[in-house]
């Protein structure tokens, strides 16, 4: 399968997987126009849409795409049932698309019903996990989001993390504010800065590498623990995650 990213709005990415026959899967189409343009340019035949959550910048293009291609099956969590979803899926279930099984993983936090889709090596994680960061907590709690990204972090090392936004540069600036002397974070920041200066995408990222540079995945790391302990003594990784998320919200 071939992985494609379609830029949308200011910083969204709509992901598309296509097979050799030209059948394709579209993930979180917040805007139909760039997707329709890509379909036309590549002669794709849309088979399915995956929705991760109900926010408009992830579902806004569904109606127009389905009107154009009525054969599309739209998979999504319960919270997207009024956004065009025709097949509601939940944690532990699978979606069989393009000849591959995609596992559905519940990841509450950004929204309460947020889900992700995984078929090795592809992880479509919506607004749960970003390179260098994680999603804002619009509906869920820090505890829920901590457990959600912990689940994703446990996936295989070679997982390709397909996030829905280009937030990497700002996330790495935050990471540097927390761990300014970390070599991995500094190296990755320089790489990301160069890519963004050329207006190039920083995604997808390999999960093994992401674990090294994403402070939200390093809540049991001694360097991070020492930094946090300078301000407040937090014994549990979950508490340290909440501390980081609060810092990031004000960054």
From Swiss-Prot:
Swiss-Prot/TrEMBL keywords: Hydrolase, Metal-binding, Zinc
Cofactor note: Binds 2 Zn(2+) ions per subunit.
UniProt: Zn(2+) 2 binding residues: 57-58, 127, 165
Cofactor list: Zn(2+)
Binding site for Zn(2+) 1: 53, 55, 110, 127
Catalysed reactions listed for this entry: an S-(2-hydroxyacyl)glutathione + H2O = a 2-hydroxy carboxylate + glutathione + H(+)
UniProt protein name: Hydroxyacylglutathione hydrolase
Provenance organism: Escherichia coli (strain UTI89 / UPEC)
Taxonomic path: Bacteria, Pseudomonadati, Pseudomonadota, Gammaproteobacteria, Enterobacterales
């Amino acid at each position: 399968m071939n992985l494609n990213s379609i830029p949308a709005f200011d910083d969204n990415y709509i992901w598309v997987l296509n097979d050799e026959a030209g059948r394709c899967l579209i993930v979180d189409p917040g805007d139909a126009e760039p997707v329709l343009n890509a379909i036309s340019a590549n002669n794709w035949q849309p088979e399915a849409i995956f929705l991760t959550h109900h926010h408009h910048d992830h579902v806004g293009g569904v109606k127009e795409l389905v009107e154009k291609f009525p054969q599309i099956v739209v998979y999504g969590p319960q919270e997207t049932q009024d956004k065009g979803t025709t097949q509601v899926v939940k944690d532990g279930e699978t979606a069989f698309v393009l000849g591959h099984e995609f596992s559905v993983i519940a990841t509450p936090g950004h929204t309460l019903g947020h889900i992700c889709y995984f078929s090795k090596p592809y992880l479509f994680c919506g607004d749960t996990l970003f390179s260098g960061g994680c999603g804002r907590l619009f509906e869920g709690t820090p505890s829920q989001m901590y457990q959600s990204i912990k689940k994703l972090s446990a996936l295989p090392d070679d997982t390709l993390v397909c996030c829905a936004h280009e937030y990497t540069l700002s996330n790495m600036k935050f990471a540097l504010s927390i761990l300014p002397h970390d070599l991995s974070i500094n190296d990755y920041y320089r790489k990301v800065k160069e890519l963004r200066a050329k207006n190039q995408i920083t995604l997808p990222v390999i999960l093994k590498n992401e674990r090294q540079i994403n402070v939200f995945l390093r809540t049991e790391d001694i360097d991070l623990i020492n930094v946090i302990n300078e301000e407040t003594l937090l014994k549990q990784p979950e508490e340290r995650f909440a501390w980081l998320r609060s810092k990031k919200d004000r960054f």
